[in-house]
Amino acid sequence: MSDNRSHIEEKYQWDLTTVFATDELWETEVVELTQAIDNAKGFSGHLLDSSQSLLEITEVELDLSRRLEKVYVYASMKNDQDTTVAKYQEFQAKATALYAKFSETFSFYEPELLQLSESDYQSFLLEMPDLQKYDHFFEKIFANKPHVLSQNEEELLAGASEIFGAAGETFEILDNADMVFPVVKNAKGEEVELTHGNFISLMESSDRTVRKEAYQAMYSTYEQFQHTYAKTLQTNVKSQNFKARVHHYQSARQSALSANFIPEEVYETLIKTVNHHLPLLHRYMKLRQKVLGLDDLKMYDVYTPLSQMDMSFTYDEALKKSEEVLAIFGEAYSERVHRAFTERWIDVHVNKGKRSGAYSGGSYDTNAFMLLNWQDTLDNLYTLVHETGHSLHSTFTRENQPYVYGDYSIFLAEIASTTNENILTETLLKEVKDDKNRFAILNHYLDGFKGTIFRQTQFAEFEHAIHVADQEGQVLTSEYLNNLYAELNEKYYGLTKEDNHFIQYEWARIPHFYYNYYVFQYATGFAAANYLAERIVNGNPEDKEAYLNYLKAGNSDYPLNVIAKAGVDMTSADYLDAAFRVFEERLVELENLVAKGVHND
């Protein structure tokens, strides 16, 4: 059973007192922020009174947004560390409600700004040079003009933001707080409570009985609740489609991608290119079956490492290795990594009620915190360098950009994290000459590629399909979702849905389906990271400098322009094809090692 949080050493818990020293200070800030937002209601109708009013109201909005983010970070992270604590559920609800109030109060901002003509805008810039620093901020709003409604309509929608977000919040509570999974046996024969945190480590077990039991226990539980999960997912899809439609977008995908100025062709190119290369995944599945010595490969066999090498890392060992590997970026990067590792930015271990998975979070005025659910595996070492990549991206951006540009597009976010993963792989393959160790590292890389490019593209294809289906009037019942997911899974892995009954329920446990066209960026990011990591490891100092400049750029330019400066053209399929070339090269090396019998040694 997962430990209670009180049993975990303080050094392995994130230090949220650096955000607010006490809960009482958080509550005081909520009261003051609520009053400040109320006071801002008088701005409505006055944004364009003068260049001075445009500057002042813009800066008040940004200041309140900055304070609100800090309030939300504290509440959400307190809740995430133990989702069963009612007090912090209430804190998160208050923070969410305050966001809705803020959005409603400033719903006048964009409609009023868009009444400004180009000539009047230029006059304002001449009168008030301080407005120049917000030029790109304004430019992005002007680009959105065809999709902004009247002030009353935007105010109405802003007031309903909690309703639109309710499906995702219901999913989180159901999945993290209410779901109870059976007791299963681990490889030692010990009975353990199945959790989100230990599921993957059980699926990585070399004991097929352990894998099968955990797999069936997990998905049979989701089977019991499939209709509830279908309703929450359907409601979320309907919300996204509705918001896109009323804002004059052709689809929810167009709406989501346009927020980051990403053309839909990037998404289509990803799915088309990955589908073209699915034979490589089928080939890897055949190799996996051969190495495992199985007559038939099942979905509960796709996570277990092919290597029997004991590449386990305690958390402290993983910290040391990560610092060694990431030193390649130079002193400035290394110094910030050390701070993250020693100043309690990270919440490390599994505990009862803790949110599953891993993430990097925080706001402009906080540390770039990380949530983990640590298991002593090579995969968790990769998770650590991945989340550190996010946190260092956030740190460099906040240090080098004003608040207005002090964040970055999610399209760019996954590049920073997976570049770190690929640098870890490149470094390990350069260091290791022994066949058995190379086998283990290659296996991990191929599994990571499978999980990041193939799997996330499968998710992206499913996500778009259900949005299109809803647009066309299809009711997203559990039966429909199960069938669609099973067919896609068979296409990707080449393993029949008849022989893998339980996998049809996997869609129910994927939180990213509530994030509105997020998952495709894991795949595009990993592919771009493949290219960047090779340049950083084998290139010249200018390549590293270009990469650090990308980390520092934040939202000061459009995402495709920012990453182009680092050397990647995301409008082309070339970066994807380059990634598949690396995958095939490493697959060939693994096939050759298998032919030599390395896996039997």
Swiss-Prot record:
Binds 1 zinc ion. Keywords: Cytoplasm, Hydrolase, Metal-binding, Metalloprotease, Protease, Zinc. It is found in: Cytoplasm. Its EC number is 3.4.24.-. Its cofactor is Zn(2+). One of its GO terms (molecular function) is metal ion binding. Its main location: cytoplasm. Zn(2+) binds at H386, H390, H393. This is Group B oligopeptidase PepB. It comes from Streptococcus agalactiae serotype V (strain ATCC BAA-611 / 2603 V/R). The lineage of its organism: Bacteria, Bacillati, Bacillota, Bacilli, Lactobacillales.
